[in-house]
């Protein structure tokens, strides 16, 4: 039997997909901008 692949971890989630990480790079800021334009309720983890 293999274990489930998704092992929730809030700290890892924030470090990998968080707002501060997105703001760090030009591409990340572009992602946030696109999500704001689209009207996403949540723009990052």
From Swiss-Prot:
It comes from the Bacteria. The keyword Membrane does not apply. Gene3D superfamilies: 1.10.287.3980. One of its GO terms (molecular function) is structural constituent of ribosome. Keywords: Ribonucleoprotein, Ribosomal protein. GO terms for biological process: translation. GO terms for cellular component: ribonucleoprotein complex; ribosome. Belongs to the bacterial ribosomal protein bL34 family. This is Large ribosomal subunit protein bL34.
